[in-house]
């Protein structure tokens, strides 16, 4: 069985992500320091809340540099995905820098509420095994007020007052802006794909 490390970055969704993994038959172990990453074959970085506090917690745990140097597949979920990018406007904080781009505050407009909350459709941008088995017009559940830009690494986007990255992959680094643990079959499929797919 795959050894899955689930990083405790202080996000309230840690337990629900762990439960979602249990439903897939995966008993992930919670990691709170660099030593906990040893032997992991997959690493999951969930998170909700604010980027500055999450980065501060990762620094306190001594996890920033080990995550930057990680040589196994990593997926960030919700705030965890945003932390993979270079910088966040939220608190003007430097993030892990594993993916190019700056996470910016979403702009409210007529009919566009921020935070973006609820179900929204994924817009495939390029092929990736992360999306294998998903139906056309698959939807996922989002809760966020900041968003990463669409880049060459974007696998799927979402439109809420403009396109933003919903699923991302660059080599071993992956991310999902939505909550897989709250996204029914879509979320379960993407988690399973991450756990089972072959990486370059």
Swiss-Prot record:
Its EC number is 4.3.2.10, 3.5.1.2. GO terms for cellular component: cytoplasm. It catalyses: 5-[(5-phospho-1-deoxy-D-ribulos-1-ylimino)methylamino]-1-(5-phospho-beta-D-ribosyl)imidazole-4-carboxamide + L-glutamine = D-erythro-1-(imidazol-4-yl)glycerol 3-phosphate + 5-amino-1-(5-phospho-beta-D-ribosyl)imidazole-4-carboxamide + L-glutamate + H(+); L-glutamine + H2O = L-glutamate + NH4(+). The active site is at residues 78, 179, 181. It comes from the Bacteria. GO terms for molecular function: glutaminase activity; imidazoleglycerol-phosphate synthase activity; lyase activity. Its main location: cytoplasm. InterPro entries: Class_I_gatase-like, GATASE, Imidazole-glycPsynth_HisH. Keywords: Amino-acid biosynthesis, Cytoplasm, Glutamine amidotransferase, Histidine biosynthesis, Hydrolase, Lyase. Pfam families: GATase. GO terms for biological process: L-histidine biosynthetic process. PROSITE patterns: GATASE_TYPE_1. It is found in: Cytoplasm. The keyword Hydrolase applies. Heterodimer of HisH and HisF. IGPS catalyzes the conversion of PRFAR and glutamine to IGP, AICAR and glutamate. The HisH subunit catalyzes the hydrolysis of glutamine to glutamate and ammonia as part of the synthesis of IGP and AICAR. The resulting ammonia molecule is channeled to the active site of HisF. This is Imidazole glycerol phosphate synthase subunit HisH. The gene is hisH.
């Amino acid at each position: 069985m795959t050894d899955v490390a689930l990083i405790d970055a202080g996000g309230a969704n840690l337990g629900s992500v762990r439960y979602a993994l249990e439903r897939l038959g995966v008993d992930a172990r919670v990691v709170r320091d660099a030593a906990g990453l040893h032997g992991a074959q997959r690493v999951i970085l969930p998170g909700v809340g604010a980027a500055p506090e999450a980065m501060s917690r990762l620094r306190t745990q001594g996890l920033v540099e080990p995550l930057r140097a990680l040589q196994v597949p990593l997926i960030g979920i919700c705030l965890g995905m945003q932390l993979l990018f270079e910088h966040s406007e939220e608190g003007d904080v430097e993030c892990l820098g594993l993916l190019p781009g700056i996470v910016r505050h979403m702009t409210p407009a007529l009919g566009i509420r921020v935070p973006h909350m609820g179900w929204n459709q994924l817009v495939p941008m390029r092929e990736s095994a992360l999306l294998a088995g998903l139906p056309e017009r698959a939807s996922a559940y989002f809760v966020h007020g900041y968003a990463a830009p669409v880049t060459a690494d974007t696998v799927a986007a979402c439109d809420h007052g403009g396109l933003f990255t919903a699923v991302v992959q660059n080599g071993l680094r992956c991310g999902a802006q939505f909550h897989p643990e709250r996204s029914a079959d879509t979320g379960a499929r993407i988690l399973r794909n991450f756990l089972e797919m072959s990486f370059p």
